[in-house]
Amino acid sequence: MKSIVIVAGGTGGHISPGVALAEVLTELKEKIGYENLYLYSLVRNKNNPDLEQAPCPVLWHNLPPLSSNFFLFPIRYTIQIIKTFFIFKKLNIDVVIGMGGYSTVSSILYGIFFRKKIYLCEQNTIPGNVNRLFFRFASKVAFSLPPKNSKIPCDYQVLGNPLRKKTIPKMSLKFFEKYDTKKKKQFNVLVMGGSQGARQINNIVIALMSHEEINKQFRFRVLTGSALYEEVSKKSKKDAELISYSDNMKEHYEWANFVIARSGSGVLSECAAFALPMILIPYPYAKDDHQMANAKYFELNGAAIVVDQKDEDESHLFRVLDQMANDVNLLNDMSISSLECSHVDASKDTAKYFFSLD
């Protein structure tokens, strides 16, 4: 075996598990027996903190977005595919690991045309279009969550979403703090909208903060997303704790008693590792409604409560928060269920599965 490439483009939901897998593969270099390991990502991700801290060289490509000029898109796309072929041939790439998304297409096509090993990682219960298209060409597929349709035309296992080392808690067992309701302690609520932020969630929480009874029982820390920070700052109270972006999520997970978030696989996996109960507001316009499917998995397993809405009315979330504040046993049970859904060793398990290691 000569070289391995991990193709992780798109959003943080593809990049972070790709870098996590690279961390483990770097440690297993001698066991696997490869010479070189690379990450392959879109040029627009050059400032991504995970890629800036990657444990191996990062190669960049400029695959045009699907929204590009209708007439120029096929030409630009073909040129980038050819460039990928030349780069990978020069580097003697023998194994292609795709983390999902349209930006993996050129790399997977290389694997197909030159008969190289192809391994795929699928983060969602409803697979993305690109992975679905290429499942039959893959030697193995690692799912983060159980697929909704079990008829996958290749060898697959459900192993969890690879987590960065810096995100994994020191203790693999962390149960929810048992609250004494007589102390009337405030609950710490971490609010997240994913790697890009979420205007809907930000606005709902800002509206909640205007209710005095909510402020008495809950303390909010809102990760707004860099692009939405100024907007939220203007709308929120002066004492609101707002953070545009954080590269140290471990600190926030350890602070939180529960989470309000979207339901991308990365966020769900990290919250589960910290045994955090979740209130999930799935992105209503996600492809194939995959965020709702992810959220329902955690709800069915007792780790989450799903709030299904497209508007910014806070009344539904108000009722859920009131329920949680007055039922500590519910929170404790959700915490244990959340931990039971976790896969803190997903990175190592995925590497061992792909490369048939004991």
UniProtKB/Swiss-Prot annotation:
Similarity remark: Belongs to the glycosyltransferase 28 family. MurG subfamily.
Pathways per UniProt: Cell wall biogenesis; peptidoglycan biosynthesis
Protein name (Swiss-Prot/TrEMBL): UDP-N-acetylglucosamine--N-acetylmuramyl-(pentapeptide) pyrophosphoryl-undecaprenol N-acetylglucosamine transferase
Gene3D superfamilies cross-referenced by the UniProt entry: Glycogen Phosphorylase B (3.40.50.2000)
The gene coding this protein: murG
Binding locations of UDP-N-acetyl-alpha-D-glucosamine: T11, G12, G13, N124, R164, S195, Q291
Record EC number: 2.4.1.227
InterPro entries in UniProt: GlcNAc_MurG, Glyco_trans_28_C, GlycoTrans_28_N
GO terms assigned for molecular function: glycosyltransferase activity; UDP-N-acetyl-D-glucosamine:N-acetylmuramoyl-L-alanyl-D-glutamyl-meso-2,6-diaminopimelyl-D-alanyl-D-alanine-diphosphoundecaprenol 4-beta-N-acetylglucosaminlytransferase activity; undecaprenyldiphospho-muramoylpentapeptide beta-N-acetylglucosaminyltransferase activity
Function: Cell wall formation. Catalyzes the transfer of a GlcNAc subunit on undecaprenyl-pyrophosphoryl-MurNAc-pentapeptide (lipid intermediate I) to form undecaprenyl-pyrophosphoryl-MurNAc-(pentapeptide)GlcNAc (lipid intermediate II).
Membrane-topology descriptor: Peripheral membrane protein
PANTHER family referenced in this protein's UniProt entry, alphabetically: GLYCOSYLTRANSFERASE, UDP-N-ACETYLGLUCOSAMINE--N-ACETYLMURAMYL-(PENTAPEPTIDE) PYROPHOSPHORYL-UNDECAPRENOL N-ACETYLGLUCOSAMINE TRANSFERASE 1
Any single GO CC term annotated in Swiss-Prot or TrEMBL for this entry: plasma membrane
Top enzyme class: transferase
UniProt source species: Leptospira interrogans serogroup Icterohaemorrhagiae serovar Lai (strain 56601)
